[in-house]
Design a protein with these regions (language model features):
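Short beta-strand segments enriched in small/hydrophobic residues
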Residues: 23-31
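Hydrophobic alpha-helical segments within soluble ligand-binding/sensing domains
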Residues: 1-24, 66-67, 113-118, 134-152
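Loop/turn elements at helix/coil->beta-strand transitions in domains of secreted/extracellular proteins
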Residues: 19-23, 48-54, 78-81, 103-107, ...
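Hydrophobic alpha-helical
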Residues: 42, 55, 60-120
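Solvent-exposed, acidic/flexible segments
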Residues: 3-7, 31-35, 59, 63, ...
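Short, solvent-exposed amphipathic alpha-helices that sit
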Residues: 6-10, 33-52, 69, 93, ...
Length: 181
């Protein structure tokens, strides 16, 4: 997937939602290249737009630490405007903390497009505002084409990037919440 674009489209939407800028939290996993690319794209989109990163939360392997750390950030900062999450499991933890703190005025962005985050987006829960989505189905189809070419000793593209796109409340029904797009 074009991970950088997945983060970029989230940042572009944040510029629309919060045109005056604001304070943001970034939930990342520095050891994971795809997450790094997503965060880079997001930060490129919001550069020089009045946003201040007030906290970076490093998600550990299964992201289980994110909820506790986000809860602490919320208790220490009354003016968080948005949270950018490098993946949907991170976003699920952030949304849980935001819901418990009753701070649903915070815009939450994520990358993936899992059924759980699309459901939160559709229902307007946990602050979920938008998803830089990828399509595991299309990624699988491309992998099969490459494998078939390899087995047949034919030429193939060595680098394949699947298009990423933005899902929000206006178009989430088109993608559904019962599976991946």
């Amino acid at each position: 997937s074009d991970n950088e674009n997945a983060g970029y489209v989230c940042g572009q939407d944040l510029l629309v939602q919060k045109p005056d800028g604001g304070k943001i939290v970034i939930v990342e996993s520095p050891g994971v290249n795809s997450v790094n690319e997503r965060i880079t794209g997001f930060e490129e989109a919001i550069t020089n737009s009045g946003f201040e990163v007030v906290k970076r939360i490093e998600a550990l392997g299964d992201s289980s630490n994110v909820k506790d750390e986000m809860t602490q950030v919320l208790s220490e900062n009354s003016e968080i405007d948005a949270v950018m999450c490098g993946s949907d499991p991170m976003a699920e933890q952030v949304m849980a903390a935001i819901t418990e703190a009753q701070r649903t005025n915070i815009c939450v962005y994520s990358v993936d497009g899992s059924p759980a985050t699309k459901t939160a987006l559709m229902n307007g829960t946990g602050g979920m505002t938008g998803i830089g989505a990828q399509s595991p189905i299309n990624m699988g189809k491309t992998a099969v084409k490459v494998a078939t070419a390899l087995l047949a000793d034919k030429d193939y593209e060595k680098d394949n990037y699947e298009e990423t796109f933005f899902i929000n409340r206006d178009n989430v029904e088109m993608y559904g919440t019962d599976g991946w797009q």
